[in-house]
Amino acid sequence: DYILIMAKGIFVVEVKGGRISRGKDGLWRYRDKYNVVHTRSEGPFDQAQSGKYALKNALIKEFGDQEMKNVSIGWGCIFPDTVNIPQSEEVSKETIIDAKDCDTPEKLLKAINKAMDYWFNKKYYYKEIDSEKIRKMHMGLRPVFEITPSISVRVNEIFNQLVCLTDRQYHI
């Protein structure tokens, strides 16, 4: 859902709101605000983790393996509507941010920093990212672009302008 680039590294965040469950069949079920249930085989932790690896591969392709080897890339899940997420061996508690961590922006930032510290401290060779490298990563991930309306949209706009002009001319 989100990518945060900070001095201590990059943090890939999966946000899951509403009611969440994993059944005996291993499938995850998400009930949205409209009470519609969505079923997925990949849970939020797997989504965040696979997002991390996809991002890491994209950054290596963009900046090179040597440039990225000392950069900490972590992942976590935010559950803004839920407290006391069940713990499992496959997920570290530092990667989970729940509703009590989201009460205020300060608490959320503290929880994100705690998660980033967890990932940053996993390897002795991780180095902080300087502001220029952060800027380059930001531009590499979010390049400047321009989107223009399709021809059919422009034709409809022009047609509506002509109708408007014709109506005004008729009244003159």
Put a short name on every predicted segment.
Residues I5-F11, R19-S21, D25, K33-H171:
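Surface-exposed interaction regions that form or flank ligand-binding interfaces
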